UniProtKB/Swiss-Prot annotation:
A molecular-function term among this protein's GO annotations: quinone binding
PROSITE patterns, sorted: COMPLEX1_ND1_1, COMPLEX1_ND1_2
Catalytic activity reported: a quinone + NADH + 5 H(+)(in) = a quinol + NAD(+) + 4 H(+)(out)
UniProt keywords, alphabetically: Cell inner membrane, Cell membrane, Membrane, NAD, Quinone, Translocase, Transmembrane, Transmembrane helix, Ubiquinone
HAMAP family: NDH1_NuoH
Transmembrane stretches, start-end: 11-31, 81-101, 114-134, 154-174, 186-206, 237-257, 265-285, 304-324
GO biological process, one term: aerobic respiration
Family: Belongs to the complex I subunit 1 family.
Family annotation (Pfam families): NADHdh
Record organism: Enterobacter sp. (strain 638)
The organism's place on the tree of life at top rank: Bacteria
Protein name: NADH-quinone oxidoreductase subunit H
GO cellular component, one term: plasma membrane
Length: 325
């Protein structure tokens, strides 16, 4: 097999790694929906889904079958093309955002020198999906939910990006692998604690998760921008939301908690355990916090998160300049 050159083998292995990592992310996002319902049942002193399979283990399969056979309905006066594209853009952008996350020293889909900027770009692209969904549905509740979601996401992406600049300044690179290697001695969560707090809050808001789920507030907007979606289109939005949680959790681990670094266990196991911990924290937050008003969410972002990120960035810059002297 003379055509099987070393360069071609490297390319095929890279493609295989990318496919495996992205499939694992999609699977984790899907299974998180089942895990969330089980954990919410535990937190609220009830059973949760336990009828399909042993202990409810096949509930996810039942949900997938139900969603697959539901009518793929499109509203009569909607923009059919944009209405169909919106869930695809949402799912794809959130999945591609995970591509820059290194799960071990040798396993990463795209080891980009502008990794953090690529993530912020994909997070911004997801806003278009929400706007497209709300506008193309020709529904006032969808449009209001899309306007809420876009304003909230764009606002908190500012704090999300600023909270990462301290980490970038310390590592001297936008590359995620370089940032992880820079945490071999001390995790960034210690010198960048306020940056981590702001990133965690902004990450929950960007994912539209409770308590920042005003764009989907059932009591006010009847499920917001995807009220008109059903079948697999709704499934793409649904799984995409959980993929966003997986991505934000993985970024917390990579940027602030040493990535794959840890004693005794293999690097991938450490990364998976840390990521699973933060995924559970998302669920715990949903189970324990009330939903504030929309104006309170926006006010909190601009009056609390923004000053905190700016102070953190200024202090980090001052410390780096002092150490350089």
């Amino acid at each position: 097999m003379s055509w099987l050159t070393p360069d071609l083998i490297d390319i095929l292995l890279s493609i295989l790694k990318a496919v495996v990592i992205l499939l694992v992310v999609v699977t984790c996002g899907a299974f998180m929906s089942f895990g969330e319902r089980r954990l919410l049942g535990l937190f609220q002193n009830r059973y949760g889904p336990n009828r399909v399979g042993w202990g409810g283990s096949l509930q996810l399969v039942a949900d997938m079958i139900k969603m697959f056979f539901k009518e793929d309905w499109i509203p009569k006066f909607s923009d059919r093309v944009i209405f169909t594209l919106a869930p695809m853009i949402a799912f794809t952008s959130l999945l591609l955002a995970f591509a820059i996350v290194p799960v071990s020293p040798t396993w990463v889909v795209a080891d980009l020198n502008i990794g953090i900027l690529f993530f912020l770009m994909m997070a911004g692209l997801a806003v278009y999906a929400v706007l497209f969904a709300g506008w193309s549905s020709n529904n006032k509740y969808s449009l209001l939910g899309a306007m809420r979601a876009s304003a909230q996401t764009l606002s908190y992406e500012v704090f999300l990006g600023l909270s990462l600049m301290g980490v970038v300044a310390q590592a001297g690179s936008f590359n995620m692998t370089d940032i992880v290697n820079n945490q071999a001695d001390i995790w960034n969560v210690i010198p960048q604690f306020f940056g981590f707090v702001t990133f965690a809050i902004a990450g929950v808001a960007v994912c539209h998760r409770h308590p920042f789920d005003q764009p989907e507030a059932e009591q006010e907007l009847a499920d917001g921008y995807h009220i008109e979606y059903s079948g697999m289109k709704f499934g793409l939005f649904f799984v995409g939301e959980y993929i966003g949680i997986v991505t934000i959790s993985a970024l917390m681990v990579t940027l602030f908690f040493g990535g794959w670094h840890g004693p005794f266990l293999p690097p991938f196991i450490w990364f998976a355990l840390k990521t699973a911990f933060f995924m559970m924290m998302f669920i715990l937050i949903r189970a324990s916090l009330p939903r504030p008003r929309y104006d309170q969410v926006m006010s909190f972002g601009w009056k609390v998160c923004l000053p905190l990120t700016l102070v953190n960035l200024l202090v980090t810059a001052a410390v780096i300049l002092w150490q350089a002297q």
